[in-house]
Amino acid sequence: MASRPSAAKKQPAKKAAAPAKGPVKKAAAKKAPAKRAPAKKAAARKPAPQPAPNPTNGVYRLVRALWLGLAHGVGAVFRGIGQGAKNLDPAHRKDGVALLLLGVALIVAAGTWADLKGPVGDLVEILVTGAFGRLDLLVPILLGAIAVRLIRHPEKPEANGRIVIGLSALVIGVLGQVHIACGSPARSEGMQAIRDAGGLIGWGAATPLSYTMTDVLAVPLLVLLTVFGLLVVTATPVNAIPQRLRQLGVRLGVVHAPETDEFTNDDERYDEQWREALPARPRKRAQPAAAEPYDPDAAEQEALSRRRGRPRRSAVPQPEMNRPMDAVDVAAAAAAALDGAVLHGMPPSPLVADLTQGVSTGDRESTTPTPTPVPAARPQPGKLKKDATKAAGGEPAGGAVPDLTKTPLPKERDLPPRAEQLQLSGDITYSLPSLDSLTRGGPGKARSAANDAIVASLTTVFTEFKVDAAVTGFTRGPTVTRYEVELGPAVKVERITALTKNIAYAVASPDVRIISPIPGKSAVGIEIPNTDREMVNLGDVLRLAESAEDDDPMLVAFGKDVEGGYVMHSLAKMPHMLVAGATGSGKSSCINCLITSIMMRATPEDVRMILVDPKRVELTAYEGIPHLITPIITNPKRAAEALQWVVREMDLRYDDLAAYGYRHIDDFNRAVREGKVKPPEGSERELQPYPYLLVIVDELADLMMVAPRDVEDAIVRITQLARAAGIHLVLATQRPSVDVVTGLIKANVPSRLAFATSSLADSRVILDQPGAEKLIGKGDGLFLPMGANKPTRMQGAFVTEEEVATVVQHCKDQMAPVFREDVTVGTKQKKEIDEDIGDDLDLLCQAAELVVSTQFGSTSMLQRKLRVGFAKAGRLMDLMESRSIVGPSEGSKARDVLVKPDELDGVLAVIRGESEG
C-alpha cells in the first residue's frame, strides 16, 4: 500500500513533463548546426582467434615454389631453343624437316611392315591404316621419297606446293578407287571393313560420289583426279604427254632416239626447265602453279613479262640493234677492199682490209680442230623491238606483300649455248665461246635473320628519337640491303637524314647511305651493307634471257643491283664510259668482265679492240686474241699515237657516211649487207661493213702525265664525234683528280661507273655528286649511265683468271690476230725527224704556242707559264730558235717572234713531224 502512492505521484510528473518536449526539441534543432555532438566510435572488433600452425602448410609452399621454379626454368630453356631455331639457317631447317620425315617414315614402316607392338604400333595402326586402308604399306615409301627430294633439291622450294597438291590429288583418287573396288563398305559395317578397303580417305572421297551418282560415274571422276595428280607431280602438261612417253621409251631402250643436233637438245632442256613451277612472286595473285593448264610458250612469255614488268636493271631501255648476225662471207669482200680504189679522192679505210688476211694455213693446221655445228637461228629484229618495247613498262600492280621483302631473286634458267658459227672467210668459221666456260654462282638470299634484326634496330631508333616513320620493306642485294622507310604526315625528310650517325651506331655499320627519296617511290631508302656478302659471277649475268635474246655485240654485263636484278648495258648506247675508283675497289675486275663479255658475244668481224695498259700487268691475259687491232700498248707515248690513229679512222668513216648519206654506222652496214650501197662507176673498191672499234685505256693518269695535251685533244675529239662512227671509248683510272679527268673529258663522257673512292672530292669528280666515298669496296659501285638522273648502286660482276684464260684460249684457237702496223708508227717517224727534241716534244709545242700567240719571246715567261726551270726554258728557246720561230738572243731584251699567229698550225705540224716542210 505504501508503494502505490509513490507510483501515482510519479505518473503526473511524467505527464507534466511531456508537453515540454516539443519546445525543447525545436530549440535543440536550431542549435544543431552550431554544434554537433561527436559520433560515437564503433566498438573495435575482437581479432579472430588464430588457428594453430599446421606443419603441412610449409611443405605445400615449398613444393609449390619448386614446381613454379621448375616450370619457369623449363619455359626459359624452351624459349631459348625456340629463339635459336628462329635464327637457324634456312638450309638447316630444310635438312631438319627432311630428317624428321625420314624418322616418321621409319616408324610408320615398322608399324605397317613389321607389325610393331606397343603404344606406338597401336597409334600407327589407328592413324595410318585407318586413313590409308590397304595402301598403308606405301606410306613409308612416299614419306621417304619426299624426304630424299628435300635433301637433294633444297634450292627448289617453289616446287613443294605443286608436289603437295599433286600427291594429294593422286592419293585421294587412288584410295577412292580402292574403296569402290572393295565393295564400298559403309560405317555401319565397322571400322575394320573400312580399313580393309581404302581407309577413311577413300571412304570420304568415294562415298559422296557413289551416293550422289552411281559408281559408274564415280570411278571415271576418280581416275581423272588420279591422272591430274600424276601430271602435276611430274610437271607434265597434257599436250606434252606424248613427248614425255617418247622420252621415257628412249630411256628404257624401247624407242630409238631421234637424230637431233645439239641445238635441239638444248631447246628440249630449255623447255624442260620452264616446266618447273615459277616461284610465288610478291604483288601477284597467289595460286598453285599446277592449277592451270600449262602452255610452254605462254609460260615463257609470262616469265619474260614478269621480269620486264619492273624497270630494266640497266638505267636505259635497250633498243634493238639493226645489225644482223647471220653468217657473212668476209674473205671475198675484204680481198676486194685491198685494191684501195679511191672514192671521191678519199682512200678506203684500211681497217676493213685486215679481215682478209684471216688465218694462215699454218695457223689453221696448228690450231685445235673444232666441230662444225649448225648455225643457230637468230631472233627477228621485229620481235626484239617488240620485246624492248615491253621492257619499258612500269611496276606491276598487285596486292599487299605479307613480308618486308620487296623484290624476289630473279629466276635463272638454262639457256641454249651461244655457239653461232659466223663465216669469216671462205673456209673458216668462228665459234663463240660457250657459256660453260663461265661458272655458275650460288643461289642468292632474299632474306636473313640479320635483315630482321636491322629492321628492329631502325624501328627502335625512330621510336627513341620520336620520328613518325616505319620500315615498310627492304630489297636485298648481293652487297647491301636497301630498307624502305615511309614517313608519317608532316614529317620532314631531313629528320631521317639527320639520324645518319645514330642509325650507323644502331646497326653497327659505318657505311650507311641514305637516299631521299627512292626514285619512283614515296619512301626514303637506307642502304646498309650485308654481313654476308654474295659473289656475282659473270656467267650468271650472261645466262639471262635478255642477254640471249639481244644480238647487240656491245652488250656488257656489269653486275647486280641493290634490288637483286642484273645490270646489263650496251656500250653502243652509252656511248663512252669513265670507270674510276681507288686501289682494290673492283675497277680491274670490271674491265675484265667488260672485255670477256665482248669476247663471249662478238666475233672479230663485229668488234675490234685497242687495249692500252701502261701498268703492263692488267691486260696481258688478252694478248693474242683475234679482236685486237694492235698488240697491247704499254708505252704511254705510243698510246697517244694510237689515239691519234683512232681520230684518223673516225674521219675516214665519216667520209663514207657523208658520201652515201647515212647518219650512223649501223645504217651504213645494213645497207652494205643488203647491197643498197655501191661504189661509183669505174671504182674497183668493194664496200665492207665497218666493225665496232672499242678503245680501252686502263690507266688514264699515266697517259695524262706523259702527253696531256695530245691525249686530251684526241679523247675530246673521239668522244664528241665517234658515236655515229661506231667507235667507243672506255677510260679507267684510280686517280680521279681534276688534272686527270679534266672538264673537257667529263663533258664528253656521259656514262660513269664509280667504285669506292678515298675522298668526297674524288666522288664529285666522277659523278658530280657525293656517294662514292661511302662505298665499301670489292666491287661495290655506283653506275650512272647516260640519261639517268641518279646513280644505281650495284655489285660488280667477277670473273676468275681461269675463266678468262679459257675464253681467251678458245678465241685464239678460232683465229690468229691480224695487227695493223700504222697504229703506232708515228712515234718511230717522230724519233727519226726530231731526235734533238727528245722527251720535250709536248713542252716545246706548248712553248711555241705560247710564244706565237703572245708574240713575246721571253725565257722568264716560259719559266712562269710552263713551270719549268731556267735551264729547261733556255733549251726550249734554243729549240725554237733552230726552227726559226724566234730570233737570236739580244741580251736582256725579249727575242723577236718570227712566226705570225695564223702560221701556228703549220709550225706545230713541223715540230710534231707531220709535215716535211
Curated annotation (Swiss-Prot):
It is a multi-pass membrane protein. Residues 564-764 form the FtsK domain. One of its GO terms (biological process) is cell division. ATP binds at residues 584-589. Residues 237-917 are cytoplasmic. It is found in: Cell membrane. The chain crosses the membrane at residues 65-85, 96-116, 126-146, 163-183, 216-236. Residues 23-44 have a biased composition (Basic residues). Signal peptide: none annotated. It comes from the Bacteria. Residues 1-56, 277-324, 352-426 are annotated as: Disordered. Keywords: ATP-binding, Cell cycle, Cell division, Cell membrane, Chromosome partition, DNA-binding, Membrane, Nucleotide-binding, Transmembrane, Transmembrane helix. Pfam families: FtsK_alpha, FtsK_gamma, FtsK_SpoIIIE. PROSITE patterns: FTSK. Residues 8-22, 391-400 have a biased composition (Low complexity). GO terms for cellular component: plasma membrane. GO terms for molecular function: ATP binding; ATP hydrolysis activity; DNA binding; DNA translocase activity. Belongs to the FtsK/SpoIIIE/SftA family. Consists of an N-terminal domain, which is sufficient for the localization to the septal ring and is required for cell division, followed by a linker domain, and a C-terminal domain, which forms the translocation motor involved in chromosome segregation. The C-terminal domain can be further subdivided into alpha, beta and gamma subdomains. The alpha and beta subdomains form the DNA pump, and the gamma subdomain is a regulatory subdomain. Essential cell division protein that coordinates cell division and chromosome segregation. The N-terminus is involved in assembly of the cell-division machinery. The C-terminus functions as a DNA motor that moves dsDNA in an ATP-dependent manner towards the dif recombination site, which is located within the replication terminus region. Required for activation of the Xer recombinase, allowing activation of chromosome unlinking by recombination. This is DNA translocase FtsK. It comes from Streptomyces coelicolor (strain ATCC BAA-471 / A3(2) / M145). The gene is ftsK.
